[in-house]
Structures are given as structure tokens and as C-alpha cells.
Amino acid sequence: MIEPQMSVVVPVYSVEKEYFEECILSLKQQTLEAIEIIIVADGVKKEILDLCKSFEGQDERIRVVEQENQGVAVARNNGILNAKAPYITFVDADDWVEPEFCAFFYDNLKIIQMCRLYLRQHI
């Protein structure tokens, strides 16, 4: 596995299966391949946990972190604690992102080396 340059934390609790599948597919198709996808299963139902583990088995960049239901803030923090890359971003489990999502942030963060936080809203 390539050393990840960006960790993408995806907290999961209650999500429609189709939206979640689209989310993970969009992350797997990133133009920046040196990413890790950390799915934080926050007390999810068995069906969703099985889906999480299925994704983990399909792609070595995906890791599943299980926790009892503690809410999205704790799930994000748990994702941060498990991140291996120097940069971290978050994606909600019912969202999808464009293929350049990670590359855009990574390229801009590399340019602005002193940057510790970079926010961008795009709808």
C-alpha cells in the first residue's frame, strides 16, 4: 500500500445503504490515490456494519473503526486518532464527492505549508 497523504474520515450511524455505497464509491475513485478511507461505524445496525466490512475487504485503503454509538463528534475524533496521513478531511456517509476532491485540498495544503486548517464549501 502507498503511504497515505490524506485521511478521509467517514462517520457512519444511520444512513441509507444506496447513499453510503455512492459515498464510498466516490472516495475510491479519487484522482489522489494516496488516501486512506477511515469508516467510523458509530453503533450502526448489522446490515450497515457488514457493508462497511465488505468495503474494507475490497480496498486496502479502507479501514473500519467500530465504536458504540457516541455521536458524530466522537466518531470524527476517533477517526482523527486512527488517521495515518498528514492531512485529514471529513465526508458525511450520505454525501458523494467529485473525483478531484482530495487532490484539490492536498495540492492547496502543500502550497500553503503553514496552513493548519483549510475550509471550502461547495454545493
Give the residues covered by each predicted segment.
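Nucleotide-sugar donor-binding/catalytic module of glycosyltransferases
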Residues: M1-I123
